[in-house]
């Protein structure tokens, strides 16, 4: 949930697309209602404190923190992190290169946290993934093309008997022209990814 003016200049070459892609309060409420009807949990990244207050009114169960927020790139990064921390709810955090995990842990000292390995390239070249580092995290923010990296991460973590594994993947509708469309998978690929993960979950590695 973000406001285009907070994150981008109006001179950005994709400004019109970015502006149309804002997740407003009204849109968030609609998605929450649809998610509830499907029995799915709704949560999201939010980039300004008022957004946290609104999501609290929707009774979300957890929050996501984007890597750019951890890097304090945006006008309200610190205030937004503090607002999320004050809810006491679980937090999922994408740790981009340069993020201080100790600093973020201090902010969320009273929250249950899940840290995700993340390289903020769009798309991310598969060969840039440092698997030794990635497997130190319980989550993976996957910006590669396709679903191979997510499947590998899940398999490796399952082999290590990890009790909690989180995968983040950008998903788009067919012919979507959103700002992250070029690095997102379509619904059929999401279904394929979930199917692979469910098989891995049932696997025995000991």
Which residue stretches match the model-derived regions?
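Catalytic cores and adjacent flexible loops of soluble metabolic enzymes
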Residues: 1-206
